[in-house]
């Protein structure tokens, strides 16, 4: 049983079932809480809306790097001139950059935006570089795993066996609480 789940309808249904069951038969299931950091509750898409596959505004983290660069370079911006100060808080590029850059890099970009002289093209390039650097180790690991499907199958088999054992314990407790032992 888990104590926290990402926010979704699954979380709501899981909570409802656990509360109803526990109220009827006693404390068997853990009632999960939402586990999502406030700063990433809504990730902006390339068009500034909430990032969503259905909106077609996503960044494919494991996709082709040139395609990713191209998509980032197409982020819609306003017509503020390069030399003019900009508000980082009102910029989709900066909102995405904050997710991948460290604190000093975020502060530096925000300062450069406010001072003027930093164009959106510069910011898009910095965003791409931060994203590529952040996900490079994961891209390498994914390539290694794709090259060894037998290993992946073994990990999945082992994980399934562990999950079945844990699920069995919970199911046994639920059966006992209901009286189906």
Q: Where are the model-predicted features located?
A:
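Short, small-residue-biased leader/transition segments that mark boundaries at the very start
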Residues: 3-5
């Amino acid at each position: 049983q888990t104590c926290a789940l990402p926010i979704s309808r699954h979380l709501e249904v899981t909570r409802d079932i656990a509360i109803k069951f526990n109220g009827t038969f006693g404390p068997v299931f853990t009632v999960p809480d939402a586990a999502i950091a406030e700063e990433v509750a809504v990730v902006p898409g390339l068009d500034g809306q909430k990032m969503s596959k259905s909106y077609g505004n996503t960044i494919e983290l494991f996709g082709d790097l040139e395609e990713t660069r191209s998509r980032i370079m197409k982020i819609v911006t306003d017509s503020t001139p390069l030399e003019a100060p900009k508000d980082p808080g009102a910029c989709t590029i900066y909102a995405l950059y904050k997710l991948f850059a460290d604190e000093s890099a975020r502060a530096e970009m925000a300062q450069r935006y406010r001072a003027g002289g930093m164009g959106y093209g510069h910011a898009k390039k910095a965003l791409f570089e931060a994203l590529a650097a952040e996900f490079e180790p994961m891209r390498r690991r994914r390539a290694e795993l794709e090259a060894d499907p037998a290993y992946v199958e073994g990990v999945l088999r082992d994980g399934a066996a562990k999950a079945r054992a844990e699920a069995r314990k919970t199911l046994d407790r639920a059966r006992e609480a209901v009286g189906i032992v």
